[in-house]
């Protein structure tokens, strides 16, 4: 089989002949480029920083003086004016400052800090072991980066060691130094940089395997470099070593761009953002101008490709929407403060991305974890849980002077989302003036029902009531990667509690069984037929998912007193006896309940399971009257899920009535963390066509259940009679 035929076989989705040919040629070029890179490893490590001629010929002391005195380029205002920012940090955020300094102390003295959802980890008391997975204790080899197999099936997880090697903890050290002027912090910074360089020769090992990781590491190093530049510990030798490291990072990204003519993703976006940042902030490097121009051009082209018309990320993932929004937003701000023009069209697209976040945040201020999430952040000024997206709203509120975005950073009760302050990033990215601008924003209107038709996301909400319908495809124009088997799945929040939730992701390659479990149909609040997956999944391929479901929205009718959305998917059409699933969701805003109707059409007899995945920490029981009751013991709120028999079955006890059970599950709100949860399942073996209807009725703490249940059921029955 020739390389063209091989490429055609492995490319997923519809690929025309021209695109397949271009991709074939690109892959041939990659093969040749890697041969050259492999042959030049020694030279790549020995080569000094390639400086522009006017900087290459000056003395090292003059070069250091130049960096300390230069006015342009500028990093983010909070970093650039670190003394002012540090004073504001102490005065405005005293509790956060205490935590920051405590974290910096642990990082410097014991090499310990939080790692994703795994909690605090220590990485070597004497010297950090940069290539050791701190969970499995596997030592990644220093093989040529492209030879490393990331799928080992031994519990090791490249994502974990990559997080360590993004070096974001060095930004914590730098912020603490800005506040304390403690010279032990820059000493620790330089020791860790020297240690990292010694253990990670260029293009060798897992930490050079993925250009995205190289780019994110460079971004964090630029932030730390800005904060430590004024330290006496920054001498001529240290500067020379850092410039060499930045040049190596930029050159490696350029040699190993994660581009494809078929589809690009967050990886390529991070690659080009990394080149843009290095190019903007280090014009002294000979390659900087080319990196800056290429990075900006590609960044904007990727916004055209990867951001849908309604502002949503095209990878069918709210987690990667957050990451991409950070990449675009921070890059746009960096360009703006350095006089680099970005067309208004792209600022409008950026605003649309922020609008999407504002719409999908639940009343508790948390994000629904649709699709994959690895908890990734660009500059983790504060390490945020995977479902914490409110801080990007704070940045968006200030940039676009939009009070609605500011209102979205708080819960419906006026508290910070999850009790975590959202202004830290504001202060360090936009500076003290940005924080003042944010604080001056007043006035807003409550969020309302909203459709994101391109993304396939529909939000039916009023006051404390929130239901999200997911009618998205598997992502990347149907090619899949970070999508889940969640077609027509729902999320429900009411009375200040998230009741029905997406399960999240948990882990990727560390455990393929859990990886597939968390993205399975059975783990989502939708209907499963004959135990089949909505989209095909390959057990050995954790980042491939089919697009057989192809959800289609039939109707969307928002209104003052009621909302309606109707959608269907075709994932079960590939069964021996094909089945189509149509879901209709009605939101009665007056009587405060939702009615969900599932219609299964086709031929033959099938096993059908209607599930809702419930949030952890709730008490769930099946009552004697058949109602599933979900209770939040903390605030007294309950959610009642009532199976409504079709009109012709009311009052009857029939052989194929639904059996209700509670199934043990897990939920993950952060990469690497999981908690026990429950799914309620109504199952039946029945001939098709078949329909089932469920009334979802919230009862807040001070409400009378009998009155709420009676009025909602009467209204639901009336609605069913009309249908």
Task: Name these PLM-found stretches.
Residues 1-62:
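Membrane-proximal basic amphipathic "stem/tether" segments
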Residues 137-361, 366, 374:
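Aromatic-lined, polymer-binding surfaces characteristic
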Residues 54, 58, 62, 66-70, ...:
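Beta-strand-rich N-terminal accessory domains
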Residues 134, 446-448, 456, 595-596, ...:
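Beta-sandwich/jelly-roll carbohydrate-recognition scaffolds of carbohydrate-active enzymes
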Residues 165, 271, 353, 454-456, ...:
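Residues that flank catalytic or metal-binding motifs in active/ligand-binding sites
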């Amino acid at each position: 089989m020739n390389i063209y035929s091989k490429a055609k076989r492995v490319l997923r989705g519809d690929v025309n002949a021209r695109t397949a040919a271009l991709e074939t040629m690109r892959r041939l070029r990659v093969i040749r480029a890697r041969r050259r890179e492999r042959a030049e490893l020694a030279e790549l490590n020995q080569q000094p920083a390639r400086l522009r001629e006017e900087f290459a010929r000056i003395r090292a002391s003059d070069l250091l003086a130049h960096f300390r005195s230069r006015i342009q380029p500028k990093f983010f205002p909070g970093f650039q004016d670190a003394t002012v920012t540090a004073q504001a940090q102490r005065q405005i955020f005293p509790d956060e400052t205490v935590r920051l300094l405590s974290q910096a102390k642990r990082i410097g003295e014991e090499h310990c800090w939080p790692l994703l959802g795994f909690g605090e980890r220590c990485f070597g008391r004497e010297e950090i072991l940069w290539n050791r997975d701190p969970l499995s204790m596997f030592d990644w080899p220093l093989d040529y980066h492209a030879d490393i197999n990331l799928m080992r099936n031994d519990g090791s997880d490249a994502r974990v060691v990559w997080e360590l090697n993004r070096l974001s903890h060095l930004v914590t050290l730098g912020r603490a130094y800005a506040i304390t002027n403690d010279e032990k912090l820059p000493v620790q910074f330089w020791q860790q940089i020297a240690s990292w360089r010694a253990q990670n020769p260029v293009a060798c090992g897992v930490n050079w395997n993925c250009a995205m990781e190289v780019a994110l590491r460079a971004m964090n190093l630029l932030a730390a470099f800005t904060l430590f530049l004024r330290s006496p510990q920054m001498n001529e030798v240290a500067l020379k070593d850092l410039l060499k490291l930045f040049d190596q990072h930029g050159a490696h990204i350029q040699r190993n761009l994660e581009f494809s003519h078929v589809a690009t993703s967050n990886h390529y976006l991070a690659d080009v953002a990394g080149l843009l940042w290095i190019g903007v902030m280090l014009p002294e490097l000979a390659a900087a101008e080319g990196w800056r121009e290429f990075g900006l051009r590609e960044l904007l082209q990727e916004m055209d490709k990867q951001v849908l018309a309604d502002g949503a990320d095209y990878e069918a993932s709210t987690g990667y929407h957050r990451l991409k929004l950070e990449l675009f937003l921070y890059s746009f701000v960096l360009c703006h403060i350095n006089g680099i023009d970005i067309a208004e069209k792209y600022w409008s697209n950026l605003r649309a991305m922020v609008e999407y976040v504002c719409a999908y945040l639940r009343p508790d201020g948390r994000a629904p974890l649709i699709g994959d999430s690895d908890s990734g952040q660009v500059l983790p000024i504060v390490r945020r849980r995977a479902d914490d997206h409110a801080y990007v709203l704070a940045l968006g509120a200030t940039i676009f002077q939009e009070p609605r975005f500011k209102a979205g950073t708080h819960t419906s009760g006026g508290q910070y989302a999850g009790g975590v302050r959202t202004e830290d990033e504001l202060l360090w990215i936009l500076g003290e003036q940005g924080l003042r601008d944010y604080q001056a924003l007043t006035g807003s209107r409550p969020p309302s029902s909203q459709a994101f038709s391109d993304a396939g996301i529909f939000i039916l909400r009023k006051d404390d009531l929130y239901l999200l319908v997911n009618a998205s495809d598997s992502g990347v124009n149907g090619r899949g990667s970070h999508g889940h088997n969640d077609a027509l799945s729902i999320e429900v929040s009411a009375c200040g509690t998230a009741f029905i939730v997406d399960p999240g992701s948990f882990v990727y390659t560390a455990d393929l069984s859990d990886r597939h479990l968390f993205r399975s149909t059975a783990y989502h609040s939708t209907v499963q037929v004959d135990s089949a997956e909505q989209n095909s999944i390959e057990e050995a391929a954790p980042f491939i998912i089919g697009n057989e479901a192809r959800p289609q929205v039939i109707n969307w009718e928002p209104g003052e007193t009621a909302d309606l959305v109707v959608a269907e998917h075709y994932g079960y059409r590939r069964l021996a006896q094909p089945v189509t699933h149509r879901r209709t969701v009605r939101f009665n805003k007056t009587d405060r309940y939702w009615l969900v109707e599932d219609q299964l059409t086709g031929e033959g007899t099938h096993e059908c399971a209607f599930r809702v995945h419930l949030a952890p920490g709730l008490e769930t029981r099946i009552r004697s009257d058949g109602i599933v009751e979900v209770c939040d013991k903390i605030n007294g709120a309950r959610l009642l899920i009532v199976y409504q028999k079709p009109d012709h079955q009311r009052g009857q006890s029939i052989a194929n009535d639904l059996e209700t059970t509670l199934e043990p599950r897990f939920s993950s709100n952060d990469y690497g963390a999981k908690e026990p949860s429950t799914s309620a399942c109504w199952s039946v073996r029945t001939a098709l066509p078949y329909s089932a209807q469920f009334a979802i009725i919230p009862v807040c703490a001070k409400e009378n259940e009998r009155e709420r249940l009676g009025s909602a059921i009467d209204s639901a029955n009336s609605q069913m009679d009309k249908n």
